[in-house]
Structure formats: C-alpha cells, structure tokens
C-alpha cells in the first residue's frame, strides 16, 4: 500500500469526477507552477496530498460498509474504480530516488497516458479489497512490516535502471529482512520487466540459480 500510494494522483478532487483536479498538484498539467526539477517542499506537499486522498477513499469505504451493516447486509460488496493511479513525481523527475531510468517514463509506458487510462494495478476494487491492498492505515500487505518476520534465506534482486521500483524500495526491503542470511544483487542496466532485454532477464535468472545452489536449495 505504500508504493500504491506513492503512485496515486494527489491532484484528484472528486473521486466521482476525476477530471476535477487541483492544478498546482497536477504533475501533468503544463499550467502547474511546480515543474521538474521539483523542490523538496513540493514533494512533501504532494506526498501529503496522496496520503490524504487515500484516507478519503478509506473513510468512504468504511462508511459504505457500515451502511450495509446497518441494513443487515454484512456480507454485501460494492465495486468501484480508483482513477489516476500513475502519478509519482519521480516518473518525471529522475533526480528523485535516482537510478538509471529515463524521464517521463514508467514501467507501463508514458506515465501521463497510463494515469488517464483504465489500466493499472489494483484499479478495480471492492470495498474490502481496498482495505486489504490500498488503505494507508488498514492494509496489511506491507513488505517492510512483513519482511522482519521472514526466517528463510533471502535473495533480493534490484535493477539499476528500474522504471517501477526505485533504489530506496529495494534497499529498504533488504534492510527490513530480520536476519543475516540475505543477499542483495543488482542487474546493471536492467529495467523493471526486462522489456527488450532478454540478456538481463537471463542474468537475473542465472543469479537466482547460482544463489539457490549456494544455499543448497536445488
């Protein structure tokens, strides 16, 4: 849920009309006075807006579930769409959590196009799936929190040109693993899904194979 929230468009004012956006938070609006390279102050304000939007949706979800419960429909569900979910400033400003990725690009393509499209991770939600995977305060799908409980050997692979998961995510996950039998390897020049990079995909697979052999797991 942390990563999802980092991608959430903080400019959306009305969930029922995502065309209504706050211009000074809309990173894709040319009229936004805040343009790359972004100031630390803007990033702080924007991150707060993303969390605020997440919590606003969570409050609506909780109200909806309570409404059903009062009517005697405790198991009732309700589907909805989370609009504009690919608006992380780091897609436009590669100086944020820098690596070798190119600007104005993300792991799904041109970020503005993806943000306005019906595609994307976890766009289609039920009330309970929102609480499970999206909610900033209720979701338990949290890699950093769960990693400390891992007891088996771990290999973490990062890609140096990753256009989806930036270095802090990889490093933080590795550091969160609560034991010493862990290793962090990097695939130089690799993007998130190894698109157009079969040699990088093979390198990653061979890295996994070698580690599994070292651990006597195969």
Each predicted region: which residue ranges?
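Short alpha-helix in the alpha/beta-hydrolase fold that links the catalytic acid
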Residues: 4-10, 142-143, 152, 166-175
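Alpha/beta-hydrolase-fold enzymes
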Residues: 2-107
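Short beta-strand/loop motif that positions the catalytic acidic residue
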Residues: 149-151, 155-158, 162
